[in-house]
A protein has these predicted regions:
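Compositionally biased, low-structure terminal segments
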Residues: 13, 69-71, 84
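Acidic, low-complexity, intrinsically disordered interaction modules
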Residues: 26-80
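Residue-level detector of alpha-helical secondary structure
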Residues: 18, 22-25, 77-87
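Negatively charged, low-complexity tracts enriched in Asp/Glu with abundant Ser/Thr
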Residues: 2-38
Length: 88
């Protein structure tokens, strides 16, 4: 059964956001803003030179408490591995 996302610490990261960021990373995109299925706006930032990855949620132009500062590509990889295990 496919789950709708994963918990990262105390926060829920929706599956559609994970999938979108995975696609952006495959394409080499370093920054993107889009509207998720939840109606929130999401911003992804990646700085490949240092491995920094940040995913921030906005509603009405204001940053929400739902943000994910992975800090490194390794931390993002751990989250993705957890997500992929749920798909099996």
């Amino acid at each position: 059964m496919k789950r709708e996302g994963i918990m990262v610490g105390e926060k829920f990261l929706p599956a559609d956001i994970i999938e979108h960021v995975l696609n952006l990373r495959r394409l080499g995109v370093q920054k993107d803003i889009w509207k998720g299925y939840d109606g929130y706006s999401w911003m992804y930032t990646c700085m490949p030179e240092c491995g920094y990855i940040d995913i921030v949620c906005y509603r009405g132009g204001l940053q929400q408490d739902i943000s994910f500062d992975f800090g490194t590509s390794a931390a993002w990889s751990v989250a993705v591995d957890e997500y992929l295990k749920l798909l099996d």
